[in-house]
């Protein structure tokens, strides 16, 4: 029978519930179990697709085109699985589904209520995730903190699941904070005690408490927490700040967390073999070289907006025993006068995805600098579109060239709406989303990176290169190295007379893994290292 683990959080948000859940998933997978994982977000948006990155961070796109929480990126990178649309559920999705059923008459004229209708819908999403993947273990992270009014239906639903399928098939893990008061020189357990009290008042008794802390947790403190929270002392797990995220699974294993889980769920699996993972962490901790990449974006104040990009750069660096340092450059501050000062000390330049016109001209200046000074360049989504616009303006001399998204009245719409997007009015869930094939031209940097004729990558865009300009740009040395199989849509562009200048319409960062870097990032970092060594 499928087992279910629920991860909740208390005291404050951003405690690392997602990393805890992902780390446990990796440990259980390495015990030979088929693991899937999902995130329940209590906000009323249907998905984060239309939310500002300042509100939510990165939008992570799955193979099947779901726009999801950034924690799914952690899940995929840690557990090395590809998730789907069932892996992220919001209050908005739940209510939308229930209301549609009510309109269809599926409730037979009954009064639709939070209990049982909303809670039953939540439970169905939990069970469906296990059914769709045939999982041995389903890990479900509940977003927000215990006590939030938005979370109550989710907590009630996961409480009911234990009654539905039995205590041996359900486990509750609660993540909390033990703050350190510097002035007093003390760590305080009271917030954790109150958080667990709140959870228990809702009918959920945690089986494991994971305490986030800056300082070591003494045995006396663990005993105190165990007493007040009514759990075994060994089930108080310390989650101290780590030098690398990838060390967290090893820390949890050292404290036997995965064994406690298996004992509770009656899973008789051998211990997790973490030899390869340990080697990865040792490599990460002992990188001998450095390279610096400029990330020119408009959300640089909130680095979570580009978390998969940064992780993909790091993964690529691991292959070359290199620590990739990211220099955050606010695109709004970049001008032709100061670009040398802002990016001149870096070994490569990356322009990531985005929407809207803010910071666009600064990104174009940075791209021009990379092109003219032979600095390795990687453009992603909007970065690819702006690389095309920069070339049209400054090489072809098409003054005023732009994207119709940024300037609907541009005389040269180098980037324009996809034909199928012309009549779309809704913003949410209407982009070109998910995994699509890309055919690569031989003897190009893109082909050399992948070494395959056709690759599949994840997309999230509404605008596309305007084929009207392809012949003139090709004549001038602009290479269309990747297209859709029918040749209609431009997927990858690069420059002929440049050491390494590649830009992709898709989001290659979404499929990178710590032990298997994404090919374009791998070659971009290699080119950046070569550039540094040649200076």
Swiss-Prot record:
* SUPFAM superfamilies the UniProt entry points to: Class I glutamine amidotransferase-like, P-loop containing nucleoside triphosphate hydrolases
Quote the Pfam families the UniProt record gives: CTP_synth_N (PF06418), GATase (PF00117)
InterPro entries reported in the protein's UniProt record: Class_I_gatase-like, CTP_synthase, CTP_synthase_N, GATASE, GATase1_CTP_Synthase, P-loop_NTPase
User: What are the binding positions for L-glutamine in this chain?
Assistant: 54, 354, 382-385, 405, 462
In the record, what terms sit under GO molecular function?
Answer: ATP binding; CTP synthase activity; glutaminase activity; identical protein binding; metal ion binding
Summarize where CTP binds, as residue positions. Answer: 13, 148-150, 188-193, 224
Sorted alphabetically, the keyword list is: ATP-binding, Glutamine amidotransferase, Ligase, Magnesium, Metal-binding, Nucleotide-binding, Pyrimidine biosynthesis
Pathway(s) it belongs to = Pyrimidine metabolism; CTP biosynthesis via de novo pathway; CTP from UDP: step 2/2
Q: Where is the active site?
A: 381, 507, 509
Region (Amidoligase domain) spans which residues?
A: 1-267
- Additional observations: CTPSs have evolved a hybrid strategy for distinguishing between UTP and CTP. The overlapping regions of the product feedback inhibitory and substrate sites recognize a common feature in both compounds, the triphosphate moiety. To differentiate isosteric substrate and product pyrimidine rings, an additional pocket far from the expected kinase/ligase catalytic site, specifically recognizes the cytosine and ribose portions of the product inhibitor.
Q: What does this protein do?
A: Catalyzes the ATP-dependent amination of UTP to CTP with either L-glutamine or ammonia as the source of nitrogen. Regulates intracellular CTP levels through interactions with the four ribonucleotide triphosphates.
Family indicated by similarity = Belongs to the CTP synthase family.
Designated name of the protein? CTP synthase
């Amino acid at each position: 029978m499928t087992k279910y683990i629920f991860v909740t959080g208390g005291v404050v948000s951003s405690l690392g519930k997602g990393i805890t859940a992902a780390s446990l998933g990796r440990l259980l997978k390495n015990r030979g179990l088929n693991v899937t994982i999902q995130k329940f977000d209590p906000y009323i948006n249907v998905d984060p697709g239309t939310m500002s990155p300042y509100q939510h961070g990165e939008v992570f796109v799955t193979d099947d085109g779901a726009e999801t929480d950034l924690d799914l990126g952690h899940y995929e990178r840690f557990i090395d699985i590809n998730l789907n649309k069932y892996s992220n559920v919001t209050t908005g999705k739940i209510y939308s589904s229930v209301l549609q059923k009510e309109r269809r008459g599926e409730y037979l004229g009954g009064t639709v209520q939070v209990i049982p209708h909303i809670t039953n819908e939540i439970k169905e999403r939990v069970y469906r995730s296990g059914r769709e993947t045939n999982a041995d273990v389903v890990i479900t992270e509940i977003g927000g903190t215990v006590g939030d009014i938005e979370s109550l239906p989710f907590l009630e639903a996961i409480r009911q699941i234990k009654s539905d399928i039995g205590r041996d098939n359900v486990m509750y893990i609660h993540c909390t904070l033990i703050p350190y008061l510097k002035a007093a020189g003390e760590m305080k357990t009271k917030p954790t005690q109150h958080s667990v009290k709140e959870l228990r008042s809702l009918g959920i008794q945690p089986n494991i408490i994971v305490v986030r802390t800056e300082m070591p947790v003494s045995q006396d403190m663990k005993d105190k927490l165990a007493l007040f929270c009514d759990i075994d002392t060994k089930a108080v797990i310390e989650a101290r700040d780590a030098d690398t995220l990838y060390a967290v699974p090893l820390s949890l294993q050292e404290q036997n967390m995965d064994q406690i889980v298996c004992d509770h769920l009656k899973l008789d699996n051998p211990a997790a073999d973490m030899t390869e993972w340990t080697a990865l962490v040792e490599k990460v901790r002992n990188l001998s070289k450095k390279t610096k990449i400029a990330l020119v974006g408009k959300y640089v104040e909130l680095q979570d907006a580009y978390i998969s990009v940064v992780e993909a750069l790091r993964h690529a660096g691991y292959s070359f025993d290199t620590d990739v340092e990211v220099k955050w450059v606010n695109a709004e501050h970049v001008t032709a006068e100061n670009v040398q000062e802002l990016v001149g000390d870096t070994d490569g330049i990356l322009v990531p995805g985005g929407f809207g016109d803010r910071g666009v001209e600064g990104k174009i200046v940075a791209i021009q600098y990379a092109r003219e000074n032979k600095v390795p360049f990687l453009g992603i989504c909007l970065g690819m579109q702006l690389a095309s616009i920069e070339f049209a303006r400054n090489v072809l001399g098409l003054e005023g060239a732009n994207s119709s998204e940024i300037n609907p009245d541009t005389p040269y719409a180098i980037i324009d709406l996809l034909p199928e997007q012309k009549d779309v009015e809704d913003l949410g869930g209407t982009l070109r989303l998910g995994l699509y094939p890309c055919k690569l031209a031989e003897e190009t940097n893109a082909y050399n990176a992948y070494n395959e004729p056709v690759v599949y990558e994840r997309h999230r865009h509404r605008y596309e290169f305007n084929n009207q300009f392809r012949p003139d740009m090709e004549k001038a040395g602009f290479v269309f190295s990747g297209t859709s199989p029918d040749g209609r849509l431009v997927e990858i562009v690069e420059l002929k007379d440049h050491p390494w200048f590649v830009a992709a319409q898709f989001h290659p960062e979404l499929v990178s893994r710590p032990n298997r870097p994404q090919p374009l990032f791998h070659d971009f970092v290699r080119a950046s290292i070569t550039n540094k060594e040649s200076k």
